[in-house]
Amino acid sequence: MFHYPDFFKVGISEAGNHDNREYEDDWAEKWQGLLKTNSDGTTNYDNQANQLVAKNLKGHLLLAHGTMDNNVPPYNTLLVVNELIKANKDFDLLLLPNRNHGFGNEAYMVRRRWDYFVRYLLGAEPPAGYELKPPPGGGRGGFAPPQ
């Protein structure tokens, strides 16, 4: 959404790793090599640093993060939030208390994701407070209970 703002109209980032410099070194170095600073001050990691291009946002963006995420810490998303605010961009932020990295299958997050796309892609208002329930006969139906 930041690199192709005229193409992407709606996006959702859940527990996003927005800058490999703020993540585990072994992951970043595996895919981008050792951090190198160029003579112009840019680095080989800049192309993966969303906060550097957040000002380009044009569409609707929902950022979601678990407050107890110990894989990709919430400050990774807050880097982008800070730059969106500086650029006076509208966006939506959902912080899920006491959730770790794997909240994406929780019924609430699934509903919020669906609602966001219905609202901003379909242009319709989703049913208010729709509750995803397990299928008859038990089971979770693929949805995780709240943590």
Language model features with spans:
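Active-site-proximal cap/loop segments of hydrolase catalytic domains
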Residues: 1-147
